[in-house]
Every structure is written in C-alpha cells, then in structure tokens.
Amino acid sequence: MNRQVDPLPIDSTSYSLSSKPPAPSERREGTRHLSLFRVGAITVNGRRELCLIKNISEGGMLIRPYCDLAAGTPLIIELKTGCSVPCTVSWRRDGSVGVEFETPVDVVEILSTAQEGPRPRMPRIEVDCFATVRDGGRVYRMRVHDVSQGGVKLESDVIVESGADLVVSLPGLEPQAAAVRWSEDGFLGVTFNRLLPLSDLVDWLRATREQLCAA
C-alpha cells in the first residue's frame, strides 16, 4: 500500500508592499507570497559579504547574514538585479537581521525587473588567491580575481578558447567541473557546471580571509 507523504514546505524569499521593514516576529501566514531573490551581497565597512534574503518590503529587508552585524550598522545591500540599496541594521535575532532602507524601494518594479529582464548576475566576491586549472591534459596555475556560487574570474597568460571544458580547483574546495564563458584581454570568465553551496562558499571565503590576515 502506497503511503502519501506531504511535501516539505518551500523556504523561499517573499515580498510585501508594506512601507515598513520586516519585524522580528513578523509572520505572514495566509498572505500570498511571490518568489523573489535568494542570494544577495552586502557591503559593510568596505568589505563585501554574502547573505540570504528572506523577505523584502518597500521599507526594508529580513536577511540572514554570514557575518556579525550589530544594530545601527550602516551597510549596502546588492540585489541580484544589480540594484544597490543603502540601509541600516535595525535588529538581530536568532541569526536573522532586519534592515531598514534609507529610502523606500519599488518592490513591484524590482520584481518585474527580476522576471522580465536578463538573467541577473550572482553576487561576486573579490579574492586574491590562485586556482589550479586543468584543460584536458594541460594544467595551469591562474590568479583568481573574484568568485561566486556560479563561477570565477581568472587571470591567464595562456589562451583558452571560449566553450572549453575545464576543472577548476580552489584551495580548500572540491575540484569543480566548469566551462569558459568568455575570454578577453588575459582574463577568463568561467562558469561552474553546478552551483557551489552557499554555506561552502561562505566557509571558504572566511578561511581565505583568515589566511590572508595571518600572512
């Protein structure tokens, strides 16, 4: 006898037309939500970090940062549409942070841009390290300029054609099957065949920064 199993609830980003930023205890049971952004980037004290965006309203956001943020901290949130929004941390609780925008945003316009415009770029984090790149039987050492869940930008003094299949190894991460998306002026845009898990990328960024600070 087959037993029906209820599907797990989907943890997706939601949006609201409210002019107020999300509150710590805000629950929107019974309110219709639309899927919006999943991963964003924040700039705090000149440093770029990744975050998860749980909820966005016209007045603010509910995010899960991967760094310590105290109430009153000014920062800039970058959405996957490329829009950057100045804001201030208003509260923190159980790993979630509420931020208030300096000026209200048009949620409908942001949503429309995300659905109808070109596919947005994933937030990229600038790094300074080297990767081992395998192109068939050839192996190269290339400088990494930035990294995202979806790929890396590499500096190369060798010519690698667009579309070439590669294996990219970043120190401390599993080798990633990838392909060259573009090649120009000594730089390569490389796309991973599979997205890096956000938690793995954040842990790697932290470890990389700790090594740089200790050097």
Predicted features and spans:
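Structured alpha-helical
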Residues: 1-215
